[in-house]
Amino acid sequence: MSTPLSLQALAKKILATQHISKNHYFILKYCGLWWHGAPIMFSTNEDNQLMIKSAIFKDGLELNLALMKAVQENNYDLIELFTEWGADINSSLVTVNTEHTWNFCRELGAKILNEMDIVQIFYKIHRIKTSSNIILCHKLLSNNPLFQNIEELKIIICCFLEKISINFILNEITLNEMLARLWYSMAVRYHLTEAIQYFYQRYRHFKDWRLICGLSFNNVSDLHEIYHIKKVDMNIDEMMYLACMRDSNFLTIFYCFVLGANINRAMVTSVKNFYTNNLFFCIDLGANAFEESLELAKQKNHDILVEILSFKDFYNSNVSLLSLKTTDPEKINALLKNYRSKNIMRYKKLCPKIIRWARFII
């Protein structure tokens, strides 16, 4: 059970949730609601997670991460304040750098961290989808000795990275590189422009990684920037393969298609991965590798795909999709914003058993 807030801490918490005129900033300074020359704001995000905002963290930090930053700065007032607001005081020991601050945090209840504690802290702080949070996670956790030799943490990060079509061998890179690639991929996945630019400037040798993440996470805007503007080169059919590694990646599949990637290969890849939405999208774009796809579906015992492919004579390409030959991200987004495959509609009419398979198809 959490400790009740003191009246003073509660008053500060309420004040930090209000919009305060610049004329009254002196009140915030007096109350200690001031950080890096600007007010501290307290809020919750869409997942009901506690967030701290300030001038240099304008889109928000997870509360425990804010505590870790305050500890690194040896800011005792904020350490106490963030702890009273609900931050886990144990997380303070991740960034403590002086004996006095160590003792201060211990007096507030911080306990010596074991490996499981460190893994739990990582879970708490790393999922917040803001540029401020991702960049600060990278700064505070990179080269942090507490994180270096925890096998479970490495396994967690490896499992995430393996879901992307990585172009490196996980066992041959350091934990710091794993973490950097993790943060970078999250920035691309959630369209966090500030974080993307931060990692691009810091890790220019990761250009291919940014391209891979753009393809994997259906971020056509960033894909266009890194491929067309930054001139990162990759075989177009390899790019299409990467785009097909997640279902419903319509934006990046279309982008690769316009560049000239083989749509029949994409169709076969979709069958191989059992991605029905990608399969229908490829058919909409004119793919006709039905015989090869049907044989593959039979080999893999994908009965639903065998059934879908058996109606090949009833499917047609989508003229409205084929009429737009552009790699402009805005136009692609507009084209596919409300996309629904007409061939799926045809299949539903032809196949009375569709209800059994509805969960597989958009």
From Swiss-Prot:
Q: Which Pfam families match?
A: ASFV_360 (PF01671)
Q: Where is the signal peptide?
A: none
InterPro entries xrefs = ASFV_MGF360
Q: Its GO biological process terms?
A: taxis
* Family membership noted in the UniProt record: Belongs to the asfivirus MGF 360 family.
- Relate the protein's function as given in its record: Plays a role in virus cell tropism, and may be required for efficient virus replication in macrophages.
* Protein's UniProt name: Protein MGF 360-2L
